Amino acid sequence: MDYNKRSSVSTVPNAAPIRVGFVGLNAAKGWAIKTHYPAILQLSSQFQITALYSPKIETSIATIQRLKLSNATAFPTLESFASSSTIDMIVIAIQVASHYEVVMPLLEFSKNNPNLKYLFVEWALACSLDQAESIYKAAAERGVQTIISLQGRKSPYILRAKELISQGYIGDINSIEIAGNGGWYGYERPVKSPKYIYEIGNGVDLVTTTFGHTIDILQYMTSSYFSRINAMVFNNIPEQELIDERGNRLGQRVPKTVPDHLLFQGTLLNGNVPVSCSFKGGKPTKKFTKNLVIDIHGTKGDLKLEGDAGFAEISNLVLYYSGTRANDFPLANGQQAPLDPGYDAGKEIMEVYHLRNYNAIVGNIHRLYQSISDFHFNTKKIPELPSQFVMQGFDFEGFPTLMDALILHRLIESVYKSNMMGSTLNVSNISHYSL
């Protein structure tokens, strides 16, 4: 069996579900209720929510009642939550600015819970590389399997592109261009938009979030980290005008300290491939171009990924492929789909891959949870499956870990350093992490 192929649909395990404790699940608002909760709801045989923690216990109680979480308990303190033996996996779905102050004591308190096996943290891991390294060390010392929410790796479009590249359908990669729109960081700001995403240092900005997710996806698709990078980061829009829900200007301007434009270029370690990337803030538009375009040019063919938003990890993309071979999706039984009788192996063809009704916001997180389930229950019957692994790297199987997050944090740190120094940096050792 080839474990580097894309996963087939997993079977439902005949075992007790993974018991999940949430920090940040709120039925009234937030990222967790929009993504994590519906994903778990679709995998109710594999996961069960058993614990909630919020600084205000009333929020957790209200969430349990509203979502009818009959097996869940609301905990009054972080210590009592982390110590509970009813939790197998803790999910951190709060603002990045609070990750360090919550996760560090949580890992210490969790030593009283012998059943804790998994720690799942939303990207970014922390507000800085130093904080991220500290969280990684604490999690490693605690001995839990870690997961980071770089869910773009689970997008069906990214996995298909990765297959086409890894199986040689486009030959050797010659060059890559990326252009994206970061949306929030233009001249206008919705009045109800949270203030923290416009303030530098909170771990949510054009470089860390928009670029970070996209460049992780690119490295994953191409199975290569960068060797050299050069970057320019701009904040040319230091103030934004507030607008209401209908787009009407409110006559009030507010400060913005996060970047609104990024120019990035570099070369991949594998093949010395040049990569150019531009991300801008501003009102997304469908009038002239897509808000995300990734062009990958090879010696035998080309790939193009397009999306209506500059956030590849939560967008329903379209994948275009032009080359000499395609249309060989693996079937569930491991066999190849039959080619069209009129198919000419030497003739250039084009493939358009798009799932019309795919909800990428929930779907990619759902696939991430499915991968955790596959690992926990070994639903693919992989012989000698390890009880833990340090990083996913570029493997098809598994899920991204805090080590994968550290490597990405180091690249982002290098982006800001390159901008500050005005020079090209050697980042070839970025994945050789010794702590």
From Swiss-Prot:
One Pfam family, short name: GFO_IDH_MocA
List UniProt keywords, sorted A-Z: Acetylation, Carbohydrate metabolism, DNA-binding, Galactose metabolism, Repressor, Transcription, Transcription regulation
| The keyword Repressor is annotated on this UniProt entry | yes
Question: Carries keyword Transcription regulation?
Answer: yes
Gene Ontology biological process terms in this record: galactose metabolic process; negative regulation of transcription by RNA polymerase II; positive regulation of transcription from RNA polymerase II promoter by galactose; regulation of transcription from RNA polymerase II promoter by galactose
Molecular function terms, GO-annotated? DNA binding; identical protein binding; kinase inhibitor activity; nucleotide binding; RNA polymerase II-specific DNA-binding transcription factor binding
**Superkingdom of source:** Eukaryota
Q: Which GO terms describe its cellular component?
A: cytoplasm; nucleus; transcription regulator complex; transcription repressor complex
* InterPro entries in the cross-refs: Gal80p-like_C, Gfo/Idh/MocA-like_OxRdtase_N, Gfo/Idh/MocA_oxidoreduct, NAD(P)-bd_dom_sf
Residues found modified as N-acetylmethionine: M1
Q: What else is known?
A: Present with 784 molecules/cell in log phase SD medium.
What does this gene product do?
A: This protein is a negative regulator for the gene expression of the lactose/galactose metabolic genes. It binds to GAL4 and so blocks transcriptional activation by it, in the absence of an inducing sugar.
Quaternary structure and partners: Monomer.
Family, as annotated: To K.lactis GAL80.
Q: What is the name attached to this protein's record?
A: Galactose/lactose metabolism regulatory protein GAL80
Q: What is the lineage of its organism?
A: Eukaryota, Fungi, Dikarya, Ascomycota, Saccharomycotina
